[in-house]
Amino acid sequence: MAKVVKFDSEARAAMIRGVDILANTVKVTLGPKGRNVVIDKSYGAPRITKDGVSVAKEIDLEDKFENMGAQMVKEVASKTNEEAGDGTTTATILAQAIVKEGVKYVTAGMNPMDVKRGIDAAVEHVKASLIASAKKVKDTDEIAQVGTISANGDKEIGNMIAKAMQKVGNEGVITVEEAKGVETELDVVEGMQFDRGYLSPYFITNADKMTTELENPFILLHEKKLTNLQPMVPLLEAVVQAGRPLMIISEDVEGEALATLVVNKLRGGLKVVAVKAPGFGDRRKSMLDDIAILTGGQVISEDIGVKLENVKLTDLGSCKRVKVDKDNSTIISGNGKKSEIEARCAQIKQQVGETTSDYDREKLQERLAKLAGGVAVIKVGGATEVEVKERKDRVEDALNATRAAAEEGIVVGGGCALLYASQSLDTLKVKGDDQKAGVALVAKALQAPIRQITLNAGVDGSVVVGKLLEQNKKNMGYDAQNEEYVDMFAKGIIDPVKVVRTALQDAASIAGLLVTTEAMIADKPDDKDSGAGGMSGGMPGGMGGMGGMGGMGM
């Protein structure tokens, strides 16, 4: 396949056209008065969204050189979304500003590599300044404010996320699903829940709810199948004498063993429920170990030399309550040692950091949440499917933003944190005029987000930036929703520092590479016109031959 090569200003001009098309489409969504973007789908209704990365992902340009620029900036949005879960529009705007300013300096004859060194030095300096100015999140009100800002001013979403985080903790799992109805609601499962129900409906204790509920039960964890209860008789007698119920979790309970348990339950001799162990293969072993640590018990496994006939009551786990329905089992308030549970959580966290598989990471995080606190589900409602999807995008962004805020703290919102951080660049010392130009262009680019927020609100960004830089209060900012200057912390207009920092870091990383680009190579486009001409010329003659079919003896 033949290639086309472009050099110098011709290459950079094509690249910038692509950057502009993508960034200009994404940046209309920024701020409280940002607009929506409608995306056509090959099936079903179009998608309406304000999520920067969702918009960026849909853009592919026909011109291959322009498309290269667009794809590089798309990478900025994707990377920021991956790391911080929000701030994708800000990252895209910063990348566009750095590229456009950088290319101006390079076109004017400055050395691209030195300009990039200046950009890198400035970004590191600003990141340090942002982290130094961050405040720790103190209460659920601040969590709710972060969620509200990220959900485009929707207080209901902000409050719901704050409530969910309060219930399950920062380590807990919060998932977002589409609801069946119009209302958005929060469903919290406390304790450890896994997707295995009772093995027989005869275990039910609450006929109205079709559930088994046991108070203060012993929990037997067995790795293999139970087919015969003979080895367990001494243990079962000890449980009956203790006057407490029993929950059995094993690979399976079948045949005679299950029948014996059911008969004992029906006769009233033993309150019992049997469920299958969660997961498969190695994951099942890990989850049984998790339950053992949570409940203060031991997994009965012949691998470690423990036989069923030798099990004592001290080998069993226990908890405050278990609740089992036909699909799920929930263990509430396990009696395991707190120090052991924390050590297990730390071990799983380490595995999360080491794994390269997204699927494994998700499963490990689920295990961590079940050990650490619980699971909350936010069910997003709406009048139409399109509205539900748009709302779900905002809930996911808000959820990611609140997690980031809890992790690293918060700074003033509305683009002001970057604006004030740009002032710290006055003290940064670099070598040579070309590197100074790199620092200067970052200082200018840091104004781009607040200018875009004000532009989307129909206000002149230069006036707002000028007013804010004239005064000395670093908490002051511009409330674009109400068009007034306010104390941003007092008004609850705040951003997670992790989101702002990641947006700048990723934008500068890709933009710096684009600024240093001197040549671009792409496949030569097919000459469609000549191909089509050949076809049309050949057709009549070919078709004419078919007239001979009339002479066939049919």
Swiss-Prot record:
Annotated catalysed reactions: ATP + H2O + a folded polypeptide = ADP + phosphate + an unfolded polypeptide
Entry annotated with the keyword ATP-binding: yes
UniProt binding sites for ATP: T29, L30, G31, P32, K50, D86, G87, T88, T89, T90, G414, D495
Keywords, in A-Z order: ATP-binding, Chaperone, Cytoplasm, Isomerase, Nucleotide-binding
GO MF assignments: ATP binding; ATP-dependent protein folding chaperone; isomerase activity; unfolded protein binding
EC number: 5.6.1.7
Subunit structure: Forms a cylinder of 14 subunits composed of two heptameric rings stacked back-to-back. Interacts with the co-chaperonin GroES.
Name of the protein described by the UniProt record: Chaperonin GroEL
Lineage of source species: Bacteria, Pseudomonadati, Pseudomonadota, Alphaproteobacteria, Candidatus Pelagibacterales
This protein's encoding gene: groEL
